[in-house]
């Protein structure tokens, strides 16, 4: 089946939506896959009303086609902004997304990447501001290090389904990153809905200091927290103490199911942009840790519509305040 919609098919979609017919039935009627119809309506409907008309849809499709074949011009103002945001730790995708969110003209992220690599070929250094993708780091030495039976462990299967929706603030994920030769450790906590992160240097990798630092780090948002999810490391053996002092529920992933804490794994990767693999964490200061935390909480995220975690946090809190008042 074709993935491209013709002008005649757009007219048919417009008419059938008015009947109304389901998107699946429309797809069968015009001979395309239902995903093609869903994508067509989503891309070419009216942004404000959500309604679909053949005329508007065709104009949008024609404009998109023209832009695709038009060479993008990287203006001096764009170059200046790109360099500024690269130095702040933004990726090309974040530069484009944030610029469009703020109504600032910007080329595509593909064009930015091409410009960066052209700069590299000329001996430039812009590429050094890009994150290194695909790098793996050892958090606890061997695969089985730090694992064992945790008394009172509550499995992730018991966690409320609402946590999966990522709609409310206060469903957190927690982890530790261990430095070179097991020297020093860092505690990372992040919120699933907003990507807001708390990073703290640990005085030790044992369960008692981990619990103490976790409670201290979250004291200001204690009344907003619902759950915390961790892996099965022994450093979280004092989970009941954390749960009691924060008045929340504490859950554990299944062994070696790191994807069940996907947001936290991603956050740890972002931290590695600033603290590379092989770094002795005992050399990292609390001031540096706070600087990294501030950077990540004020960096736009694609999954947040290029809002920053702090902006998304304020948005959710404000929405909840309005709902409560109503």
From Swiss-Prot:
In terms of SUPFAM superfamilies, this protein maps to: Homeodomain-like, Ribonuclease H-like
Tagged with keyword DNA damage? no
Keywords attached to this entry: DNA recombination, DNA-binding, Plasmid, Transposable element, Transposition
Give one GO molecular function term: transposase activity
Ranges for domain Integrase catalytic: 156-317
The GO biological-process annotations, alphabetized, read as:
DNA integration; DNA transposition
A single GO cellular-component term from the record reads: cytosol
Q: Which residues form the signal peptide?
A: none
Q: What does this protein do?
A: Required for the transposition of the insertion element.
The entry assigns this protein to a family as follows: Belongs to the transposase IS30 family.
What name does the UniProt record give this protein? Transposase for insertion sequence element IS4351
């Amino acid at each position: 089946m074709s993935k491209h919609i013709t002008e005649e098919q757009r007219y048919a979609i417009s008419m059938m939506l008015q009947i109304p017919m389901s998107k699946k039935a429309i797809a069968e009627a015009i001979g395309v896959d239902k995903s093609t119809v869903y994508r067509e309506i989503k891309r070419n409907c009216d942004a404000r009303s959500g309604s679909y008309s053949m005329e508007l849809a065709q104009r949008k499709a024609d404009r998109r086609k023209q832009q695709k074949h038009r060479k993008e011009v990287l203006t001096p103002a764009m170059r200046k902004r790109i360099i500024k945001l690269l130095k702040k730790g933004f990726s090309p995708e974040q530069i484009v997304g944030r610029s469009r969110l703020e109504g600032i003209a910007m080329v595509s992220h593909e064009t930015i990447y091409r410009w960066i690599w052209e700069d590299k070929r000329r001996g430039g250094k812009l590429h050094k501001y890009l994150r290194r993708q695909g790098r793996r780091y050892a958090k606890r030495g061997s695969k089985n290090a730090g694992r064992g039976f945790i008394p009172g462990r509550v499995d992730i299967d018991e966690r409320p389904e609402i946590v999966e929706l990522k709609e409310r603030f206060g469903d957190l994920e927690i982890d530790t990153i261990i430095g070179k030769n097991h020297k020093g450790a860092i505690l990372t906590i992040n919120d699933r809905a907003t990507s807001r992160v708390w990073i703290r240097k640990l005085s030790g990798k044992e369960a008692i200091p981990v619990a103490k630092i976790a409670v201290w780090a979250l004291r200001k948002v204690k009344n907003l927290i619902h759950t915390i999810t961790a892996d099965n490391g022994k450093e979280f053996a004092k989970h009941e103490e954390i749960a009691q002092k924060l008045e929340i529920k504490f859950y554990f992933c299944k062994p070696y199911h790191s994807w069940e804490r996907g947001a936290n794994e991603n956050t740890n990767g972002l931290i590695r942009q600033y603290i590379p693999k092989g770094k002795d964490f005992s050399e990292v200061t609390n001031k540096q840790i706070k600087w990294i935390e501030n950077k990540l909480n004020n960096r736009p995220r694609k999954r947040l519509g290029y809002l920053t975690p702090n902006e998304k946090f304020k948005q959710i809190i404000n929405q909840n305040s309005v709902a409560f008042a109503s």
